[in-house]
Amino acid sequence: MQQQTSADMNLLWGQLILEELARLGVKHVCMAPGSRSTPLTLAAASQTQLTRHIHFDERGLGFMALGLAKASNAPVAIITTSGTAVANLYPAIVEAWLTHVPLIILSGDRPPELIDCGANQAIIQPAIFAQYAKQVNLPTPDLGYPANALLSTIDHALANQHQPVHINCMYREPLYPTELVTLAHVKKTASVTTSTYLAPLNQWFENTKPLTRYASLTSAELPTTDTLMRFVHGKGVIVVGTLAPEDNPQQIVALAQKLGWPVLVDAQSQLRQHPGVIGHVDQLLLNPKANKQLEQAERILVFGGRFISKRLLQYIAQQSWHSYWHVVKHGDRLDPTHQSKEFYQASVQAVCQLPWPRSSQANWALQLLPLNESLESLFKQQIDNTTFGEAQVVRAIALAQSDQHILFIGNSLPIRLYDMYAPIATNTPAIYTNRGASGIDGLIATACGVAADKNAPTTLVMGDLSCLHDFNSLALLKQMTQPFVLVIINNDGGNIFNLLPVPNESLRNDFYRLSHGLEFGYGAAMFGLAYRQADDIESFNQAYQEAFEFNCASVIEVNVSPTQASDQITQISQWVKQH
């Protein structure tokens, strides 16, 4: 009887935690099978306000949660059992920490007496994520630990938190109650002991709010009208780095038009294909005319950070700025150039709505837009109308998007090709990436998380090694109920290293490229996914268009030679330099 009471107490704590998370704005919970996390798993199963996502691989599970949180702009809970199951979340937690994505890890754990003594599946879990997650260590469930203390601990840990929080939950056996009932039913039919324990939460049970609410008050001092007038008195540029779709970066274009300054944008700005900005800035900086023009800039206003283009970063670093303002949503030091500047922790909207006057040097760089358009003409000629290749596929994908679509771009070559060559277009998709740590792991799972929350047609374009890294997550693709197209650009290895100064080809082949000779048709079949292979742009465009006719996921493999993309990048760069 005492043992069963212990199992019920474990479940009660799990239900209180999950209920409080739902009240704090959690909409999704990602779960992997495991026994020690049973109180949390059963609590999630009985919680009607949470959408549950199940996956057998914790590494992919963590990245799926990352995608869900990115898309929903809300915290997402992850439930794992003890041991290496927790450790497998580490890559996703690192990415979430660097990009301010709120993940809540609920890890089941052995009780203290079973730690560091040779007990099965027991590791030291507290602080396992080091600096990459805020840590909360809960004791084993006990009537001596007040229920309101449990909830207030959760509330405090998550207050104003935009990065991962790890809540380690120790449980003694038994873990399985005789029946699973809802928290409301527990309250209604509770024994005298349980009723006494829950009494401090009577008011909490009568509403849907968290026990403790923390108000977030912004006290940042934004520039005054006089300060704005001084800042815009001269030739300036606006540079836009990584922004989320909900940041509404179109406001920046309107601000630029008001000031009369050009806008240089990164692939992750949500503005890369906008006709009113300088999207081809990476290549434009190779052009002597454009460089001469941009060197005249005295002032710079930067939104976001984490730029992909090294040339753009070098331009920012080498200029002697009279005034340098940097706007970031969070307090990150997004400052790899280490220049003297003014940092403003504020939203895009807050800055764009300031009473900006028109610049005294408005329209000083009007020549940049025609130069940007001339590069677009070059790319049509040298990419779209030539030999089948990686950049051609990336441009075809970008052109096929609408503002109702999601485009997730993988790391290594795909994101760089999009940054360098994405076409100018009037309708552009919501862009998602994993560029905090810029790893090639977890991309399929993250994209599945984004798609699951948004329920919109989605494309993921990635390289072959990235796909091999996250192969297990093809199982998540099978769960998609909207058009989802995975485009694998297979150049047989890590051929981004063709662009780097490895001393000789033997070293490049043996230690960097790692050619594998694999194709993905049987892998797609293993997971029951529709599969097409494309060896020319006509077959690719047909397969890509047809894939969106079905409310499920499909795979298109694009086979290209190992040196095609690097050779083309070199060729185009030389042409731009000479004209």
Curated annotation (Swiss-Prot):
Binds 1 thiamine pyrophosphate per subunit. Pathway: Quinol/quinone metabolism; 1,4-dihydroxy-2-naphthoate biosynthesis; 1,4-dihydroxy-2-naphthoate from chorismate: step 2/7; Quinol/quinone metabolism; menaquinone biosynthesis. Keywords: Magnesium, Manganese, Menaquinone biosynthesis, Metal-binding, Thiamine pyrophosphate, Transferase. It is an enzyme of class 2 (transferase). It catalyses: isochorismate + 2-oxoglutarate + H(+) = 5-enolpyruvoyl-6-hydroxy-2-succinyl-cyclohex-3-ene-1-carboxylate + CO2. Its cofactor is Mg(2+); Mn(2+); thiamine diphosphate. GO terms for molecular function: 2-succinyl-5-enolpyruvyl-6-hydroxy-3-cyclohexene-1-carboxylic-acid synthase activity; magnesium ion binding; manganese ion binding; thiamine pyrophosphate binding. Its EC number is 2.2.1.9. GO terms for biological process: menaquinone biosynthetic process. It holds the Pfam family TPP_enzyme_M_2. InterPro entries: DHS-like_NAD/FAD-binding_dom (IPR029035), MenaQ_synth_MenD (IPR004433), MenD_middle (IPR032264), THDP-binding (IPR029061), Thiamin_PyroP_enz_TPP-bd_dom (IPR012001), TPP_enzyme_TPP-bd (IPR011766). Transmembrane segments: none annotated. The keyword Manganese applies. HAMAP family: MenD. Belongs to the TPP enzyme family. MenD subfamily. Catalyzes the thiamine diphosphate-dependent decarboxylation of 2-oxoglutarate and the subsequent addition of the resulting succinic semialdehyde-thiamine pyrophosphate anion to isochorismate to yield 2-succinyl-5-enolpyruvyl-6-hydroxy-3-cyclohexene-1-carboxylate (SEPHCHC). This is 2-succinyl-5-enolpyruvyl-6-hydroxy-3-cyclohexene-1-carboxylate synthase. It comes from Shewanella frigidimarina (strain NCIMB 400). The gene is menD.
